[in-house]
Amino acid sequence: MRKGSVKEVLAKIKYDPREKEEDYYVVIEHRGAYGGEKKIPVELIELGHGYFFVGEAQIPYHRILRVVRKDGKVIWETKKL
């Protein structure tokens, strides 16, 4: 499941022509959201160096908890403590 950094996984989804970015979303830690988590479709994400961007919002990669395919399969998940 966890192969490489979350940025590498997202780059593969976004730039590999065999993948469809609309088939994936990320789950981030979000203090204001119900349950403390928020889903963001990968197609709305722009990748940066230490952060990714959703519109004007700059979000650090360490806030990503999971990358999930729309069929429910977890592609990448943060390490459990």
Curated annotation (Swiss-Prot):
Transmembrane domains' residue ranges: none
InterPro entries (UniProt xref): MJ1316, UPF0248
Family stated for the protein in its record: Belongs to the UPF0248 family.
Protein's recorded name: UPF0248 protein TK0315
A Pfam family this chain is assigned to: MJ1316
